[in-house]
Amino acid sequence: DLDEDNLIFNYKSEEIENKFRFEHTFRNNGYKLNTGISYENVTYANETFNKININDDIILIDFKSRLNFNKFGAFAQLSKSLLSSRLILSGGIRTDFCDYSETMLNPLNQLSPRISASFSITEKLSFNSNIGRYLQLPAYTAMGYRESNALVNKNNLSYISCEHFVGGLEYAIGLNSKTTIEAFYKNYSGYPL
């Protein structure tokens, strides 16, 4: 039992995710098509009590929030080996969406295209590169933030987008080991402020 008169800080947070994923791979005429769907049920809960003393003025933060929503995803990726399997090209698309808000529920708002190439220079050395957009939800703390029991960020948040540009060399040391050196650039947008 906590004596609130003497309590300065108390924090309790829970993130519960129950997940389902189905994936299937098709192979035909040297092509490989990997497809899949996913579903998650998310529960987020936060209780924060914080007394902040600034120049003998007490600022009280007493916050409780519980959030439950569903996440969905679908993807497809097509790969093909060329030049006696020295070159592997791959392209794909993914969408993620959730029922947190109308904007986030539209799967067309969260399309993530990507392409990659891998070229074997020698039996042990290869050059790899990929370009793609990846999307992720904002932090649950931002999604679940409430004022006067209303989710104040619900209409302001969107998926965070990150464009990746990656290139590098991979060297196979043995059957079960490899070393890789890569350069990458990431460009983020949609981060909540």
Name the predicted role of every residue range.
Residues 18-22, 74-76, 113-115, 155, ...:
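Membrane-embedded beta-strands of outer-membrane beta-barrel proteins
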Residues 65, 75-79, 100-102, 106-113, ...:
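Extended, folded domain segments that form the structural surfaces/walls around functional sites
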Residues 116, 168-172, 176:
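Outer-membrane beta-barrel "beta-signal"
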